Amino acid sequence: MTGLPDGVDRALRVLAAVALERRQAYDALDAATGDGDFGSTFARGAAAVVRARPDDLRTAGLAFAAAAGGSSGALLGAALVRLDGRGLSDGSDAGAVAAALLDADAAVAELGGAALGDKTLRDALHPAAEALADGDVPAAITAARSAAEASAGLTARRGRSAYAGERSVGAVDPGAVAVADVLEAWVAGEPPTWEALLDRVGEAAADDAEDDRVDRAVDGLVAAHPTLRRLPGVRAVVRADSGAGPGGEPRVVLVSGGGAGHEPLHAGFVGAGMLDAACPGAVFTSPSSAQVLAAAEAVDQGAGVLFVVKGYTGDVLNFGLAAQSLTPASATVLVADDVATAVDDGPGRRGTGATVAVEKLAGALAAEGADLESCRAFGQAVADDARSYGIAFRGEEMEQGVGIHGEPGRPLEPRRHGSALAHALCEPLLAEVDPGAPLLVLLSGLGGTALLDLRRRTPTWPRCSPGRAARSSAAWSATW
């Protein structure tokens, strides 16, 4: 038992049991249009709650968010924190439970910005809470399940599934399904004990080596580079030296991060003239706000912290929460450069390749001793002027506009070669930038293209647009 009221203790055990049991099923649902990690994120947060066995919901929420990462970790953690102190007891008062669920729904809406109909867990949580307010538990469960099934007919407008646009229609939202599953389990019978749940956490950890793989990779990076160190107890890589300003004075420091699986981004760019700290999340999952906060506090020199954040919901949420909790002055550069996701009713463009340019150029300015606002303004100008576009190859077919986590792009088409491929890459980009501006061209294989192939394609840029090529300041090709 915990120090929580019996009903709340039971509800937490129900939540944890569902998350641990259905991890793979939720991942599979999420993979249909997203990056396939909702179940893993949900289970990771639940496992942290089981290990903590908290005496209040605030502690439960903070533990969940710190371990889970991603947008789901931040949102569900915030919902648990919001419920703390509501006076919930044995869970038999349907009206009190309904009010609590509506409050949790409001917390998710405020932090994540999702409206009803955006194809998120709110689409099941809100109608279930409203039905429960009338004291009708079966109606609440039916409302949640019906809403979860109906989410298949919605177009996603929040989270990574939103980048699939109309192709998200036909797939249910895993968060909405999870809400229905939890409510059904809530009335189905007694959930496992904390001891039994802890055994399940251990079994899951033995079966799933993902977190261990990321931690070992971080340790390997640090072991290979004595200029780096890992923060004790935190998955964060920082510079081993202080890296003070030109005259030894404090300077602005840069902190970034993102899901593992995109190496060398971001930890590979920790060093002089670039990042001072990087926070790797789980594979394809943004780091938690706790990671980001610890990294920022570790490297702060007193001149301010500049966060470089990619335009993904989880990154924006977790870096934003860290900035709110950070005592030193901070500022944020938001990178949103992917033209394939520039739609009016979506979550905004994804942040991709331009992140490397921002980290390098803003990092160089910080190393010269520029103040926080100058570094922010310059970094944001670089980000605002940048555009990127991705193409993936599948045998003799290719997919334009694909995301870095495998988010679907345009329908498959015959593979192009030579100048035809260069035009496919360049046309969406040239339409978005100032015709007379000098250009910095970055060609990245994202770890999936041999450097030999990247380098041989770099000269195709002049054939793509001769007039533009004359104004190219530089062309870089590598794996970023």
Identify the meaning behind each predicted range.
Residues 1-480:
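N-terminal loops that bind phosphate or other acidic moieties
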